[in-house]
């Protein structure tokens, strides 16, 4: 979803001036009739231009339902806020992927208990092995002996979502 990871974190990232200019240019390019706002279709085009994929109906519905009902579409300020949050979420997910890949030394796409033990020896050497085993069992949500990226990402996000 658009805001799932970024919502829970404090704002720690700002767009560079050139990136900010690009977002404004995309807004203007998608606002073909110079209405001052993006319609639903304009917004979908902007997402394709900035992120390289067509947003799902659910994503677009979520964004459109969050805008001021007194406006006909997404104003520039709202658009910039949406894009910033999306970029924050994208950046966070990339960081989680990077951490997972660092622990997945054999590039299998999952972590075993041994991978977990090795990782914890590096980042928390005094942690008892019993605790590492408990953490592994908790993170391995389907109890298949492997921690997938999804399991890993879920564990890192656990308790951080807004209520």
Curated annotation (Swiss-Prot):
One cellular component (GO) term of this entry: cytoplasm
Organism superkingdom: Eukaryota
Keyword Metal-binding assigned: yes
Chain ranges of the EF-hand domain: 18-53, 91-126, 127-162
Keywords: Calcium, Metal-binding, Repeat
GO MF term list: calcium ion binding; enzyme regulator activity
Coiled coil: none
Disulfide bond entries: none
GO biological process, one term: microtubule cytoskeleton organization
InterPro entries per record: EF-hand-dom_pair, EF_Hand_1_Ca_BS, EF_hand_dom, Myosin_RLC
Binding site for Ca(2+): 140, 142, 144, 146, 151
Protein name, UniProt field: EF-hand calcium-binding domain-containing protein 11
Gene: EFCAB11
């Amino acid at each position: 979803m658009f805001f799932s990871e970024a919502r829970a974190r404090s704002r720690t990232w700002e767009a560079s001036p050139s990136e900010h200019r690009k977002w404004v240019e995309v807004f203007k390019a998608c606002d073909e009739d110079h209405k001052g706002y993006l319609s639903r279709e304009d917004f979908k085009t902007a997402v394709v231009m900035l992120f390289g994929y067509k947003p799902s109906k659910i994503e677009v519905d979520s964004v459109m339902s969050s805008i001021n009902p007194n406006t006909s579409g997404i104003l520039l300020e709202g658009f910039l806020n949406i894009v910033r949050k999306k970029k924050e979420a994208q950046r966070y997910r990339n960081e989680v992927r990077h951490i997972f890949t660092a622990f997945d030394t054999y590039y299998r796409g999952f972590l075993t208990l041994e991978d977990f033990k090795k990782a914890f020896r590096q980042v928390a050497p005094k942690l008892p092995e019993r605790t590492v085993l408990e953490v592994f069992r908790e993170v391995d949500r389907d109890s298949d002996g492997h921690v997938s990226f999804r399991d890993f990402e879920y564990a890192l996000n656990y308790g951080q979502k807004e209520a």
